[in-house]
Amino acid sequence: MQMVSIKNQGCVTQIIGPVLDIEFPNGQLPKVFNALKVKGPENIITCEVQQLLGDNRVRAVAMSSTEGLKRGIEVTDTGAPITVPVGIPTLGRIFNVLGEPVDNLGDIQSEDSLPIHRAAPSFTQLETKPSIFETGIKVVDLLAPYRKGGKIGLFGGAGVGKTVLIMELINNIAKAHGGVSVFGGVGERTREGNDLYEEMKESKVINADNLKESKVALVYGQMNEPPGARMRVGLTALTMAEYFRDINKQDVLLFIDNIFRFVQAGSEVSALLGRMPSAVGYQPTLATEMGTLQERITSTTDGSITSIQAVYVPADDLTDPAPATTFAHLDATTVLSRSLAAKGIYPAVDPLGSTSTMLQPSIVGSQHYSTAQQIKSTLQRYKELQDIIAILGLDELSEDDRLTVARARKIERFLSQPFFVAEVFTGSPGKYVSLEDSIKGFNMILGGELDDLPEQAFYLVGNIDEAISKAEKLK
């Protein structure tokens, strides 16, 4: 005889904004993190159990608006956490926190689904040997290389090229690593999310004609959504990425924009649940919540999840608990500079401000390390000389300093690169530059082999051979 599972039924006893208190029959309390379904006046609202209050009551946080709900409404325990679709059918689509498509392209035909709350991989599954994740972007690979399965913080204000850099990384991982990407918009502006989607379609990162050939799945929890949705949308994106790593055994890029909004939403939920706030009004569980998310982003023997997280720094205060807690998990930082963007040097990655724990001779090799250090010291010297040049002019510098400035300006321009996703706007074909070619090119500039070439020959080219042939044309 087939067993028929009877769902636990409860009823709402109190509503405080997005927080609901729900009473269940004796001995039938749902577990913490279980998804509950509440039948609202217009649609079914999903909540997640956050606390057990005693007296057969639980406190849950709603994932959508609680407008129209009243006491006494029936609640059903699903018996499991929020579960989302995963796999190839998710590519090219936009989802909300519950894994429901929000792009008006119909339902998802996915046979597989996973709960958003899962344990991090065990020690025995982890890939511990540090290896470089080649992006094909010169400035990143050479000066602040990414770790495979590492976490990278992307710092940059509005209009310096964060979105274009993100799209180029999505494009390059698909071409060079055969991997896919998942984009988690956490507390995003809806307009920005829509712009990103349209730009991805334009640059063919999302193939609108054949969605399965797309390279990215998008998960959005926008600014206007309740804090519960913004707090969990990062986990939804991560769960989709984990499937590609564990089942499809692929290298995955996970973008979280913005990790600060994840903390902010957690802080709102914490206050609504009545917890005593900690430093600067943040939740007392800040480090635990951040750790639970970050520990699942890692390399296993099957594949890797490399995460790039945009970090908003409130009031530019790096000691604020939110960015400070994030820094503890980062392997590299990519800082975008407005002054480089103003010069027209794209990607506008600050070569002196960006850092990486991977830039050690024991990991990247002595040649790569010494080239990177020489580039940094040349650019640093150029930076120190800029005030003198502004006041007295270039002619007042010593012969050595003039040579340093000339090489630094060539390096600065050679760090720029035409992007595949920007072909539509620039008209220049995109270039993927291998690390080997980057090192060779910069060593030639540093060694003085190319001192007679004009500096504009180095602007927006791929490898050094292109710069040399461009110089021939400029003559």
Swiss-Prot record:
Keywords: ATP synthesis, ATP-binding, CF(1), Chloroplast, Hydrogen ion transport, Ion transport, Membrane, Nucleotide-binding, Plastid, Thylakoid, Translocase, Transport. ATP binds at G156, G157, A158, G159, V160, G161, K162, T163. Its EC number is 7.1.2.2. It catalyses: ATP + H2O + 4 H(+)(in) = ADP + phosphate + 5 H(+)(out). GO terms for biological process: proton motive force-driven mitochondrial ATP synthesis. GO terms for cellular component: chloroplast thylakoid membrane; mitochondrion; proton-transporting ATP synthase complex. NCBIfam families: atpD. F-type ATPases have 2 components, CF(1) - the catalytic core - and CF(0) - the membrane proton channel. CF(1) has five subunits: alpha(3), beta(3), gamma(1), delta(1), epsilon(1). CF(0) has four main subunits: a(1), b(1), b'(1) and c(9-12). Produces ATP from ADP in the presence of a proton gradient across the membrane. The catalytic sites are hosted primarily by the beta subunits. This is ATP synthase subunit beta, chloroplastic.
